[in-house]
């Protein structure tokens, strides 16, 4: 009983610490420089590498897609923004898709260019999200399944931060979900003036 109490207190302290860090991160969103030259394929690879231990624990495969049909596999894809914030946005999305996936499922991340936009997609093979919750999932502290809060960990701010990162980069985010094929988050952002002039 004492061990369970100690574990519970430890978990609560860790959660509180993570909450404070996340709130501090969110308070700094407007002040972070957004002039970094970001190569997206490398950034995605970094995020997937950092989340590989969690994916292995949950028995979920992480997949990175190349630019798509007609594009060279090693073709670089840049956008202008905050390297720190775009990393955090992708990290939160992929982490969320891992946690809510099924065992032996997969998470696929891709980045393509469409005219003067970059389209980032993160897809899972989970059970999907109820249509009624599609907008609510971006609200702070909202959880679709509150009964799994302790199991899944976190503080309920991951997707709220994702939405704010997208917003400060003048982008958009959409959610497509199906109970049979999982959930896909699609983020669209402008590539930046410098790169538009270069092409």
Positions of predicted regions on the chain:
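Short conserved segment of the HATPase_c
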Residues: 129-141
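Short helix-loop "hinge" at the ATP-lid/N-box region of the Bergerat-fold HATPase_c
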Residues: 97-98
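Conserved micro-motifs of the catalytic ATP-binding
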Residues: 1, 29-36, 73-81
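Short alpha-helical segment of the dimerization/phosphotransfer core of two-component systems
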Residues: 8-16
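Short beta-strand/loop element within the Bergerat-fold HATPase_c
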Residues: 104-116
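A conserved beta-strand-to-alpha-helix junction within the catalytic ATP-binding
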Residues: 36-52, 58, 62-66
């Amino acid at each position: 009983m004492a061990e369970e109490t100690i574990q519970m207190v430890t978990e609560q302290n860790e959660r509180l610490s993570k909450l404070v860090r996340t709130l501090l991160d969110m308070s700094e969103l407007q002040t972070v420089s957004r002039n970094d030259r970001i190569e997206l394929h490398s950034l995605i690879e970094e995020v997937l590498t950092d989340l590989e231990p969690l994916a292995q624990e949950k028995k979920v495969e992480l997949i990175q897609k190349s630019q798509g049909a007609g594009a060279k596999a090693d073709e670089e894809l840049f956008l202008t923004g905050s390297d720190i914030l775009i990393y955090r946005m992708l990290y939160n999305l992929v982490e969320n898709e891992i946690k809510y996936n099924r065992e032996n499922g997969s998470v696929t991340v891709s980045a393509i260019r469409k005219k003067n936009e970059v389209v980032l997609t993160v897809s899972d093979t989970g059970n999907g999200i109820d249509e009624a919750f599609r907008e609510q999932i971006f609200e702070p502290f909202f959880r679709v399944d509150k009964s799994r809060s302790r199991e899944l960990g976190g503080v309920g701010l991951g997707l709220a931060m994702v939405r704010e990162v997208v917003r400060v980069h003048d982008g958009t985010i959409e959610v497509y979900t199906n109970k049979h094929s999982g959930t896909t988050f699609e983020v669209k952002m402008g590539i930046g003036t410098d790169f538009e002039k270069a092409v």
